[in-house]
Amino acid sequence: FLAKKVAKKLVSHVAQKQME
């Protein structure tokens, strides 16, 4: 499902923001 790919991208984006 596409939503899973989008969710993974969102999680990666949030994780990167919290790392900074």
UniProtKB/Swiss-Prot annotation:
The keyword Secreted applies. Pfam families: Cu. Expressed by the venom gland. Coiled coil: none annotated. It comes from the Eukaryota. The modification Glutamic acid 1-amide is found at E20. Keywords: Amidation, Secreted, Toxin. InterPro entries: Cupiennin. GO terms for cellular component: extracellular region. One of its GO terms (molecular function) is toxin activity. One of its GO terms (biological process) is defense response to bacterium. Its main location: secreted. Belongs to the cationic peptide 04 (cupiennin) family. 04 subfamily. This is Short cationic peptide-4c. It comes from Cupiennius salei (American wandering spider). The lineage of its organism: Eukaryota, Metazoa, Ecdysozoa, Arthropoda, Chelicerata.
